[in-house]
C-alpha cells in the first residue's frame, strides 16, 4: 500500500489539512459527496479558495479508503457517527483512524471517542485538536496541535504523520479532556461574540476567557479529565484563539445574534456550521447530570432560546453571588 492519506470531509478543515500535509504523502484522497465540493475540487480550488496541491485527488466513493492506511475524519460533529457507519465496511486491520472534528456527537449524545469505540471496539482512535484556524493552516502559518489517544502507539503514529515544518504536534493521553475542551470552547466563543456585538471591551473578553476556562475545567474534571489538559493547547490555547478573532464562526454567530436577534438569519450570515450551537444543549445536559455550574454557557443557551436578551444575560452574570477566584 502506498504512502497515501484519506481525509473524509472537504470543508474548511479537511481542505486545510490536505493543503498543509501534501508533502507528507504520495496522494491525499479528499472524500466528498456534495456537488458543490466536487465542482470546487475539479477547479482545483478548495473550500478556502486556495488551490489544491497536485497530489490532492477527489474521491467520489469510499472504496478509495482501501488505497490509504491512514484516515482522518473532518466532518461536522453531527455527521460523525453516520460517517463511521458508512466507512466501516471498507476498514481492515491495516487502517489507522483519527478525527479532526471538534464537539460532541449530538446524534448519539456522547463523546466522539465513545461513538468511535461503539463501532470499532477493538481499535484505538485518535483526536487531532488545538488552536488552529483552517485558513491559517492552509497558508502554512506556524501552528501547534494536540494529538490525543489512550493508546501511546496510536497518538505517536499520528503525531509524526501530520507534523510538518509549520505544524508542530504534541501528544496527550487525555482524550476526554481534549474533546471537552474542543466542545466547550465553541460555546464560550459564542459568548465572546455576543460581548463583541454589544461593544464591550477587552476587559470583558478577558473575563469571559478566564471564567469560561473555569467552566470547561469543572466539566472536564467531573468526567475524569485531567486539569492540566485545560491549561494546554486544546483547552486555553483553543479557547483564546476562538474567542479572539472573527475567523471563528462561533464568535461571528454571537455577534450576529446581537445584530439580528434571530438564529436563522445569524446562521445564514455566518455561512457555515456553528458547532457551539449544535452542542450547547448536550453540554448543559451533561453538566446538569454532573451537577456542574456553567453560568456563561447557560446564559448563551437562554439567549439562543429567545428567553432573555444578551444585555439581560450580562446583567445576570455580573450580579451573581460572589465567589472565590479559584472556583
From Swiss-Prot:
The active site is at residue 185. It comes from the Bacteria. GO terms for molecular function: glycerol-3-phosphate dehydrogenase [NAD(P)+] activity; NAD binding. Sn-glycerol 3-phosphate binds at residues 102, 130, 132, 185, 238, 248-250. Pfam families: NAD_Gly3P_dh_C, NAD_Gly3P_dh_N. InterPro entries: 6-PGluconate_DH-like_C_sf (IPR008927), 6PGD_dom2 (IPR013328), G3P_DH_NAD-dep (IPR006168), G3P_DH_NAD-dep_C (IPR006109), G3P_DH_NAD-dep_N (IPR011128), NAD(P)-bd_dom_sf (IPR036291). Its EC number is 1.1.1.94. It is an enzyme of class 1 (oxidoreductase). Keywords: Cytoplasm, Lipid biosynthesis, Lipid metabolism, NAD, NADP, Nucleotide-binding, Oxidoreductase, Phospholipid biosynthesis, Phospholipid metabolism. GO terms for cellular component: cytosol. Belongs to the NAD-dependent glycerol-3-phosphate dehydrogenase family. This is Glycerol-3-phosphate dehydrogenase [NAD(P)+]. The gene is gpsA.
